Amino acid sequence: MKTPLTEAVSTADSQGRYLSVPEMQAAFGRLRTATASLDAAKGLGAKASSLAEGAANAVYQKYPYTTQQSGNNFASTPRGKAKCVRDIGYYVRMITYCLIAGSTGPMDDYLVSGLAEINRSFDLSPSWYVEALKYIKANHGLSGDAALEANSYIDYAINALS
């Protein structure tokens, strides 16, 4: 998984040199935001279950047909609802991984690269997940720098789905 810091070190090492001043400044910049990112990851992790449940309910309210149509891809049964909550929880988990890594690398590697194909294969609407992520962004309970850090990755996921 690539992060700005690992890329800088890899580039410098492949060129047989020490990190440049701008590369070190970027690394120190990441270290300054690391505390806020870790606080955000802890906060999201602690509330992941309730956020996923609430986000699923927000999807059901905006798109009521998701609970009315039968089929494996809809939430008309308890099993379907559980799968919806599980999938939304996966997005929350990816966001926490990004917060810890300090980059979109985890989301790029494990989610975004195959997202369109997965949604197409299972006939899932990206708009459902966009709605869920908007709910999470509005209700995560984070504030200050932790909220800014979390929101940047939530926005990245929303843009990847749009």
Curated annotation (Swiss-Prot):
| Functional description taken from the UniProt entry | Light-harvesting photosynthetic bile pigment-protein from the phycobiliprotein complex (phycobilisome, PBS). Phycocyanin is the major phycobiliprotein in the PBS rod.
Q: Which PANTHER family match?
A: C-PHYCOCYANIN ALPHA SUBUNIT (PTHR34011:SF4), PHYCOBILISOME 32.1 KDA LINKER POLYPEPTIDE, PHYCOCYANIN-ASSOCIATED, ROD 2-RELATED (PTHR34011)
UniProt family annotation: Belongs to the phycobiliprotein family.
Any GO BP annotation: photosynthesis
Tell me if Nucleotidyltransferase is a UniProt keyword of this record: no
Q: Which Pfam families match?
A: Phycobilisome
Gene coding for it? cpcA2
Q: How is it modified after translation?
A: Contains one covalently linked bilin chromophore.
UniProt name for this protein: C-phycocyanin-2 alpha subunit
**Membrane topology value:** Peripheral membrane protein
The residues that the entry says bind (2R,3E)-phycocyanobilin are C84
Q: How does the annotation summarize its subunit structure? A: Heterodimer of an alpha and a beta subunit, which further assembles into trimers and the trimers into hexamers.
One GO CC term on file: phycobilisome
* Major localization listed first in the record, in broad terms: membrane
Q: Which UniProt keywords apply?
A: Antenna complex, Bile pigment, Chromophore, Electron transport, Membrane, Photosynthesis, Phycobilisome, Thylakoid, Transport
Decide whether keyword Thylakoid is in the record.
Answer: yes
The record's subcellular locations are: Cellular thylakoid membrane
Q: What organism does the UniProt record list as the source?
A: Pseudanabaena tenuis (strain PCC 7409)
The top of its lineage is: Bacteria, Bacillati, Cyanobacteriota, Cyanophyceae, Pseudanabaenales
